[in-house]
Amino acid sequence: MAALSKSIPHNCYEIGHTWHPSCRVSFLQITGGALEESLKIYAPLYLIAAILRKRKLDYYLHKLLPEILQSASFLTANGALYMAFFCILRKILGKFYSWTPGFGAALPASYVAILIERKSRRGLLTIYMANLATETLFRMGVARGTITTLRNGEVLLFCITAAMYMFFFRCKDGLKGFTFSALRFIVGKEEIPTHSFSPEAAYAKVEQKREQHEEKPGRMNMIGLVRKFVDSICKHGPRHRCCKHYEDNCISYCIKGFIRMFSVGYLIQCCLRIPSAFRHLFTQPSRLLSLFYNKENFQLGAFLGSFVSIYKGTSCFLRWIRNLDDELHAIIAGFLAGISMMFYKSTTISMYLASKLVETMYFKGIEAGKVPYFPHADTIIYSISTAICFQAAVMEVQTLRPSYWKFLLRLTKGKFAVMNRKVLDVFGTGASKHFQDFIPRLDPRYTTVTPELPTEFS
């Protein structure tokens, strides 16, 4: 690891804004590019969100544009202020240290930028960046040999996270809001211990509707016969008295859960691939067919379907074994269900859910009075996390998540890739590992060190 005290004498033009010697011009160019990309990102995002949430006309007339501009200003400021503090730190310190091009410049820039964003969005941004920073630090540790990778580590992390999430889901007031609604959609309300209605009453209503349907005169078609046959199979079979899936036996309950969530996962992955498929509709029509039989479609479907079926099957099995329904069953069922990630391995999903779990447990600790509340914690965590990611983007881009690196390139119109990283190689992080062929054309009138000479510590 590079020593923090070591430095190099180069100026900000030689390392940072190699495309123009003027700090002011470079700042304005970064600002303009970042603003353009920010508007391209947030305008459709907020518009689609407003349509899905069925916002009223008043929102479109008075709130939509200000929210778009506020979020775009936040993202623009994050990129532009990084460039500003990059130059300011060089002028103040007189040289570059290993931490100044990335962490040092990004920390104050991120702190000021996040204050521009709406408070309601800061928490989500903080979770995302904290997740990304943790993943980046892990990769840094692996690259340095200080951390040993664990085979299928993301699956194990997901198993532990799923176990805790399902336990909180089963507990009264364990989860609230979107998280509770999402899990209820995935595993079904049958796994919630308490319901707002009596299960027996619901079962009676179902039976009553079924009888009324059967009393209707008319010729029974083939679909009706098949449906009646399937219902009879699902209805007759083993079901423990503690199980609340009154319309199915335990076996059909698990099978139906798998089919339902497999379909959801398959359709989600198809929808995600639609934009890219339609871009090649006229040039490569055959790619449209691949939209439906792509391998990832079935992988996500198998992941979600097996998660639900394993969770439900384990829960039913434990109810049969112990002859009772217990919230602790959710820990075992959730952990075993987490193995389903073998079908769709994703470090991003595991890390994000683990981060959200830590956040949930932290706020539960605050409510219980066992954990202190830190004001402005989201702002501070966001700033530090973003600074860590920028440090990686400058000094060792190979440890940064590829999707975030592409985002930085888009935000800066590709200028993040034209930094003079060969000069930074002296710090020992392999800064130019993926930029071996790039040599900036610098104007000798504005340089402190003659270009192309070996760099030495001062």
From Swiss-Prot:
Involved in mitochondrial metabolism by regulating the balance between mitochondrial fusion and fission. May act as a regulator of mitochondrial fission that promotes DNM1L-dependent fission through activation of DNM1L. May be involved in peroxisome organization. The keyword Disulfide bond does not apply. It comes from Homo sapiens. This is Transmembrane protein 135. GO terms for molecular function: lipid transporter activity. The lineage of its organism: Eukaryota, Metazoa, Chordata, Craniata, Vertebrata. The keyword Heme does not apply. GO terms for biological process: alpha-linolenic acid metabolic process; fatty acid derivative biosynthetic process; fatty acid derivative transport; long-chain fatty acid biosynthetic process; long-chain fatty acid transport; mitochondrion organization; peroxisome organization; regulation of mitochondrial fission. It comes from the Eukaryota. The gene is TMEM135. Keywords: Membrane, Mitochondrion, Peroxisome, Transmembrane, Transmembrane helix.
